[in-house]
Amino acid sequence: MNILNLKIIMFLLISNTIVVGGAWATSTCPDWPATRIAVEINALEQQLNKWSAAYHQQGHSPVTDDIYDQLQDKLRVWQSCRGLPDKTESQPIPGKGQFLHPVAHSGLKKLKDETALTRWMAGRKNLWVQPKVDGVAVTLVYHGGKLVQLLSRGNGVKGQNWTEKAPFISAIPQYIANAPALLTLQGELFLLMDGHQQAKSGGVNARSTVAGALMRKSPSPLLAQVGVFIWAWPDGPTTMKEKVALLQVMGFPFTAKYSEPVMSHLDVVQWRQFWFQAPLPFVTDGVVVRQEEEPAGRYWQATPGQWSMAWKYPPLQHIAEVKDIHFTLGRTGKGTVVLEVLPIKIDDKWIRRVNIGSVTRWKQWDIAPGDHITLALAGHGIPRLDNVVWRVHQRNTITAPNWDKFHQLSCFQRLPHGCEPQFLSRLIWLSGPGGLDIGGIGGGFWQELIHHELINDLVGWLLLTPEQIASIPGIGNARAEKIYQQFQRAKQQPFSRWLLALGFPQVVSVDAQWQVVLRRSLSEWATMAGIGQMRAKQIKHFLDHPDVQALADFLSTQKVVGFELTE
């Protein structure tokens, strides 16, 4: 047995796609030389900066927030592997703006989970929670009550001047009576929604829609559908209660309606879940917890402050890192590619392997170890590859095995050379629910039989004695006797199940006999309901194959139902 076949066989034995329960560490250091990890850190950092610039300068990004945040977490892991400090939160936002903000946009640091939230809230008082509105961050500047500037966030220090668009956004007051002589507000321009439920509908591309309307040279009719949520009033009233009350009087009602005092992390958990499910007038992607006490505006910087934190909703898209690529040969001789990924948890399932189909499809995806992919759960909880979101800079060449000689009628025996993977797949199918459904018999057991040369063809296990089965390490006499009895009872399985277990390409009636099936002509098969000419040819090729006929002859000697000779 060559090394490639051994790897394929061992992979088949452990190829449970989803593992429920338990946990594996996903934040591990890659097994790369120091020079390579430095290159990969630099490449990922540059890409994240480009996406960040697009997000803050243009209001949209080629990747979702979920993807960006998870790749940023990966960058942190890689940096820690080299002993580098975490600069992801303190790094200035890339890009340039022309107009200076009176007060810098500080941004938000993201809390990882409830434990991090509890830790941050400890020792702090006068805390409030708000929905994290998903829109375009702006600064509103009023002089003597008159709106004089509407600036995009830009890089947090300077932004673009959108003041000419403000008159078309009815949610923005153009004049505020009794306003402070100089009033600076920071907030979010968002797309007004009618009962949007984040848990059901997701982000619906709302932020990009607003950004596109703001960046058009001519005013867009869409601006009439834009609302504003004020989340910061630098150098404003010292209490949140007074802030939201005055904001409502000035014409900004959403802040008062969606700001709630909280005493513990459980209050935040409750509001986060409520807003995730409740119908809201805007798209959200989490909650923001902020304390009343803030530094004076002149001390704000374009990096996350410590007086407010974001706790985002669980990601809709999940990133997995490809650890290895395996090529498996199925019972019909078709090769498939399975990606081994660093384990990730989606819902309540741990994912560590993803079947992506044929070698051709794998080549189209251009996936190599180290790449990062997005996964989702399809029907029956089976993981599905959605996209490749990040490709490593250094790509190791992987050559797929040549499986041209394998087909639907190859490898009913362990030999000739190279047949082990397909033969094992045939045995796994035979004992599985699609075949004879022999309980407790799977790939590990069949591989032990092959390894100890106790089985050479697809039905040779019927000849095994309890003593032979018990000779396999780890199988005692009691279990060996149980397996032996299971094998003997399998002889009484319906004929149709036996045919399927052997690989017959069509279900037949239970009362059929092997010799009856064998005597049918090609034209007779073709005229049967649901078969047709192509399937009829497959059936005849199967029935006429000498290996299949040899199996049938053996089953006849074992008095297996349907295979007995009739006079």
Curated annotation (Swiss-Prot):
One of its GO terms (biological process) is DNA repair. It catalyses: NAD(+) + (deoxyribonucleotide)n-3'-hydroxyl + 5'-phospho-(deoxyribonucleotide)m = (deoxyribonucleotide)n+m + AMP + beta-nicotinamide D-nucleotide. GO terms for molecular function: DNA ligase (NAD+) activity. SUPFAM superfamilies: DNA ligase/mRNA capping enzyme, catalytic domain, Nucleic acid-binding proteins, RuvA domain 2-like. Keywords: DNA damage, DNA repair, DNA replication, Ligase, NAD. The keyword ATP-binding does not apply. Gene3D superfamilies: 5' to 3' exonuclease, C-terminal subdomain, DNA ligase/mRNA capping enzyme, Helix hairpin bin, Nucleic acid-binding proteins. The active site is at K132 (n6-amp-lysine intermediate). The keyword NAD applies. It holds the Pfam family DNA_ligase_aden. PANTHER family: DNA LIGASE, DNA LIGASE B. NCBIfam families: PRK08097.1. This is DNA ligase B.
